[in-house]
C-alpha cells in the first residue's frame, strides 16, 4: 500500500513573518516563492501546514 502524500506550495514571501513560522516553512522543505514540496500526509505535517496556512497552499 502506498503512502498518501500532500503537495505544498509557498505562495507568500517570508519577509516580515515570525521566526518560528520561517522555521516551519523550512521544515516543510520550501525555500523560494512558488516552490513545491511533496510530503507524507501525517498529523505532524498537517499541523505544520495549519500553522503557516497564510503562507502556503495545498495543491492537488
From Swiss-Prot:
GO MF annotations in UniProt: structural constituent of ribosome
Keyword rRNA-binding in annotation: no
Transmembrane spans: none
Any single Pfam family the record assigns to this protein: Ribosomal_L30
GO BP terms, alphabetized: translation
Keywords linked to the UniProt accession: Ribonucleoprotein, Ribosomal protein
Domain of life: Bacteria
GO CC list: cytosolic large ribosomal subunit
NCBIfam families listed in its UniProt record: rpmD_bact
Family: Belongs to the universal ribosomal protein uL30 family.
Assembly information from the UniProt record: Part of the 50S ribosomal subunit.
Protein name per its UniProtKB record: Large ribosomal subunit protein uL30
Organism: Ralstonia pickettii (strain 12J)
Amino acid at each position: 500500500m502506498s503512502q498518501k502524500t500532500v503537495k505544498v506550495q509557498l505562495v507568500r514571501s517570508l519577509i516580515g513573518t515570525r521566526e518560528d513560522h520561517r522555521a516551519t516553512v523550512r521544515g516543510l522543505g520550501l525555500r523560494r516563492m512558488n516552490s513545491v514540496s511533496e510530503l507524507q500526509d501525517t498529523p505532524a505535517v498537517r499541523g505544520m501546514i495549519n500553522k503557516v496556512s497564510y503562507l502556503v497552499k495545498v495543491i492537488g
